[in-house]
């Protein structure tokens, strides 16, 4: 126990020091319906003539990818595609994408897709200009070389990867999802275009929306007070509670869809200033072991971690209760904090997201708990998890 707490304290001190030395991150955002066209025109204005479009096969089959880059296609520039990116992308997919990029002689990457596509494209952008194994970049600030310019067009309202300087990649051999972060991985520009997200099925809308909520909550209750993370988190949290149930009930609600696209972006800006937390430390293991979609994993884990964190995070959770308009009759700060946690549970229920996952196997509990604890020590969490804490949550989440 002491070694885990000591390591956490050491890492938090080191990361705060590094944050003070880190260069400022420059990021341009185009927002609103049709903003993908603006981004493409911006790319063309930079003089790029050979472009790699990273996407996935489903988006290409649906015509979403081509719709997003219509301005590029109409301009007649040389476009190559890499669409072998799957949920929970792997280092093998990064390597395959790098080879496609090099063979095409592409000068820039335009990523069209959800968080998996954008994260994979981030590491591809670094791998294309380095002979080093990307597995050596796990952690913070290890991508020190110049990367291929990356532009992002998200097609889901969830990960906020278009606004972050980090990527999550699966190491298949180790059953591990690892985080690689550094300022050079932040997309040069992004287009938050809700028009590209209109056809999302309700289940994906729900899971990705809860992913955005998780990002915002973890940024809000973390112990590292930096920049405008609270302001961005507040915008995201209030918007998700208001807009997500509306889109889930009526996929044609364009105003709610546009609001959720911006909520995910604000949540991404929030975690980019601090980091994620215990929810992600556990949810990443579900993705690595079982391929559970990241948003769904976060949604299921979130209430358990909030209950676990309630003591030290009580004041912050009570503030969030006020933000979303729950717990007005609560007589204590603790009761108000509980009202917010209950509101998160109720939101999950309204979105038909359960409290357990069929995929989890009891024989994996010990390994998952150990991996989650080791990951969480690098996050500014309000309460540090021990293996027994994770095991208790896993037991409740296992069918």
Regions found by a protein language model. Give the residues of each.
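Glycine/threonine-rich beta-strand-loop-alpha-helix active-site module
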Residues: 92-195
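Carboxylate- and glycine-rich phosphate/diphosphate-binding segment that chelates Mg2+/Mn2+
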Residues: 166-274, 388
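N-terminal small/polar loop signature for handling phosphorylated ligands or for N-terminal nucleophile
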Residues: 52, 60-132, 246-257
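Gly/Pro-rich interdomain helix-loop hinge
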Residues: 289-364
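Short, amphipathic C-terminal "tail helix"
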Residues: 363-399
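Glycine-rich phosphate/pyrophosphate-binding beta-alpha loops
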Residues: 158, 265-298, 375-380
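An N-terminal, well-structured beta->alpha segment
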Residues: 1-81
């Amino acid at each position: 126990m002491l070694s885990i707490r000591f390591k956490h304290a050491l890492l938090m001190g080191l990361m705060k020091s590094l944050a003070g030395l880190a260069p400022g991150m420059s990021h341009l955002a185009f927002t609103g319906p049709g903003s993908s066209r603006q981004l493409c025109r911006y790319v063309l204005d930079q003089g790029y003539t050979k472009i790699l479009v990273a996407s996935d096969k489903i988006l290409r089959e649906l015509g979403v990818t081509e719709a997003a880059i219509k301005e590029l296609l109409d301009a007649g520039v040389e476009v190559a595609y890499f669409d072998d990116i799957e949920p929970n992308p792997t280092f093998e997919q990064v390597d395959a994408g790098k080879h496609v990029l090099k063979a095409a002689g592409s000068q820039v990457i335009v990523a069209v897709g959800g968080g998996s596509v954008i994260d994979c494209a981030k590491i591809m952008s670094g791998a294309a200009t380095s002979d080093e194994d990307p597995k050596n970049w796990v952690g913070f600030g290890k991508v020190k070389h110049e990367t291929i310019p990356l532009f992002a067009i998200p097609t889901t309202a969830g990960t906020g990867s278009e606004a972050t300087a980090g990527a999550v990649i699966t190491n298949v051999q180790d059953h591990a999802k690892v985080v690689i972060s550094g300022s050079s991985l932040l997309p040069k520009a992004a287009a938050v275009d809700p028009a590209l997200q209109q056809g999302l099925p309700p289940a994906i809308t729900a899971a990705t929306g809860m992913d955005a909520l998780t990002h915002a909550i973890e940024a809000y209750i973390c112990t590292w007070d930096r920049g405008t993370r609270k302001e961005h988190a507040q915008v995201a949290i209030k918007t998700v509670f208001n807009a997500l149930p509306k889109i889930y009930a009526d996929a044609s609600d364009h105003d709610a869809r546009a609001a959720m696209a911006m909520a995910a972006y604000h949540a991404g800006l929030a975690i980019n200033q601090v980091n994620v937390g215990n929810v992600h430390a556990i949810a990443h293991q579900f993705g690595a072991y079982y391929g559970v979609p990241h948003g769904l994993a976060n949604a299921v884990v979130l209430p358990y971690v909030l209950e676990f964190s309630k003591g030290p995070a009580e004041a912050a959770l009570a503030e969030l209760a006020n933000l979303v308009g729950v717990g007005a009759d609560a007589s204590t700060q603790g009761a108000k904090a509980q009202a917010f946690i209950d509101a998160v549970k109720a939101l999950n229920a309204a979105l038909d997201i359960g409290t357990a996952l069929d995929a989890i196997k009891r024989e994996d509990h010990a390994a998952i708990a150990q991996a989650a604890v080791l990951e969480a020590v690098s996050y500014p969490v309000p309460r540090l998890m021990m293996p027994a804490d994770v095991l208790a949550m896993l037991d409740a989440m296992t069918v």
